[in-house]
Amino acid sequence: RRQRQMCIRDRKEIVRTLGLPVFVKPNASGSSFGVTKVKSEADILPAVAEAFTESDEILIEECIRGREMGCGMLIAKGREYIFPITEIVSKKEFFDYEAKYTAGCSDEITPADIAPEIKAELNRLTALAYKACRCRGVVRVDFIVTPEGKPYLIEINSIPGMSGGSIVPKQVREAGMTLGELYDLIIEDTYDRDRR
């Protein structure tokens, strides 16, 4: 966390530490608002300014090459629900706002065509992240899986999109559950927890 200022020395340190490209993104935003893939040192400051329009905190992340995966999860009424994994294939530079909401700009493949051991590891890491961050309700944990099969957690979407075309509802349906059943679980679990 930094003040809303950055000097040339900071830019050079970012490039030295993380290399290029990097992702500059707000810490609290949705739908990829304020996210920029930065390919040159000169573009870091404008990307930082853009990210600060969405949040008081920003993240600067190494660009990890690989396949993007998302895994939805819910713990309700004492049971873990880990939904089928989705592979996100953006036809743009990355899975930005346009790729998310413009038909034909991305493919979301549920269930993802991945090796069983990678699926098991993503499920394990999703549950670990959910519990470590004390999440409540339904979340989506996003990963990059390198060509060597190593997963990197890139973010936890604590309020994932829940429209009919969003990733988690697709995962829920693939798991054989209706959205109504999912919402009932969330409401009942919240009601029971708040009564304790």
Outline where the language-model segments fall.
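ATP-grasp fold ATP-binding core
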Residues: 15-33, 56-65
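Short, small-residue-biased leader/transition segments that mark boundaries at the very start
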Residues: 1-8
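A structural signal for short, well-ordered beta-strand elements
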Residues: 37-40, 175
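ATP-dependent carboxylate activation and anion-phosphoryl transfer catalytic cores
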Residues: 115-196
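A short helix/loop element that forms part of the nucleotide-sugar donor recognition site in Leloir-type
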Residues: 9-14
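Short small-residue beta-strand/loop micro-motif enriched in glycine and branched aliphatics
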Residues: 32, 107-109, 164-168
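Phosphate-binding site of ATP-dependent enzymes
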Residues: 39-121, 145, 150-152
